[in-house]
Regions:
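A conditional alpha-helix N-cap/helix-loop micro-motif detector
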Residues: 26, 66, 104-108
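Glycine/proline-rich loop-helix segments at beta-alpha junctions forming the active-site rim
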Residues: 76, 80-81, 88-260
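Active-site and ligand/interface coordination hotspots across diverse enzymes
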Residues: 1-64, 203, 208-260
Length: 260
């Protein structure tokens, strides 16, 4: 899918979100907030739901939590324009309460379709309700800063999910803010791990001799629309959050990537 095709598909979904009446939240919203960002990105950030400022402007993460997210991205040399940002629910829950299970379920098809279009390498969850969509049963106090393969049923067919605290929690608790900077510093390395994992999956046997193409050959194949994400060149050091991800071309078993 080309960049233009992705953008067009995302705009169709956004139009459906703005007209949505699938749950009670449409009765109290000012604007629905479909999400925004680079349609060719490799990294998608998924928050919990819009707040007051987002409801007013129709854009995700534009309040104080959004300002912190921009600073977190800047700490690794990224801009919010480099990624795609959305939420598990697209309308503001009244009084900024937690989204209810049926509200999350009502929005699930929109998020799944967005991820199918974007086909990200990494999904970064922000907060426990977002994390619960991709890491059922995990506790954010244990899971933040770690990753695991995404269930293809979520729409991200071949991605890794990386858990973080919500920026709003970081604003309330200095210790969580410090941990959030530590966590986001690992996201570029998670991106490399996902790229290597995808390259290994894409190797195909040659019919004549049964030879399998190496990762290097896959990695250097022309990309009609390179995605502008920066990631460290070096392989992860021993002891890092993804120390079980080897630098070799072999496919990493998914159980080795489940780190908690």
């Amino acid at each position: 899918m080309t960049r233009a095709e992705r953008q067009a598909a995302l705009e169709v979904i956004a139009g459906e979100v703005r007209a949505c009446t699938r749950c009670r939240l449409h009765t109290t919203r000012t604007q629905a907030v479909p999400g925004e960002g680079d349609p060719s990105t490799e990294v998608v950030f998924v928050g919990e739901g819009p707040g007051m400022n987002e409801d007013r402007l129709g854009r995700p993460f534009v309040g104080r939590a959004g300002d912190l997210l921009v600073r977190l991205l800047g700490s690794i040399g990224w801009r919010r324009e480099d990624v795609f940002i959305t939420n598990v629910v697209k309308c503001r829950p009244p009084d900024n309460r937690d989204p209810e299970a049926d509200e999350i379920a009502a929005c699930e098809p929109y998020l799944r379709r967005q991820l199918e279009v974007l086909d990200p390498a990494v999904v970064v969850t922000l907060g426990r309700h977002s994390m619960g969509r991709f890491m059922p049963g995990a506790r954010i106090s244990h899971a933040h800063g770690t990753m695991r393969p995404v269930d293809p049923a979520t729409g991200a067919a071949d991605a890794l999910v990386f858990a973080m605290y919500h920026p709003a929690a970081a604003l309330r608790t200095p210790a969580i803010e410090r941990e959030s900077y530590d966590d986001i510093a690992r996201v570029p390395t998670a991106l490399i791990a996902s790229r290597e994992r995808r390259a290994a999956r894409e190797r195909t046997p040659v019919a004549a001799g049964g030879v399998t193409a190496g990762t290097a050959a896959v990695a250097t194949a022309p990309d009609p629309e390179p995605k502008p994400m920066r990631a460290p060149e070096a392989s992860p050091e021993p002891g890092s959050v993804i120390e079980s991800q080897p630098a070799s071309a072999d496919l990493v078993p998914t159980d080795q990537l489940t780190l908690f």
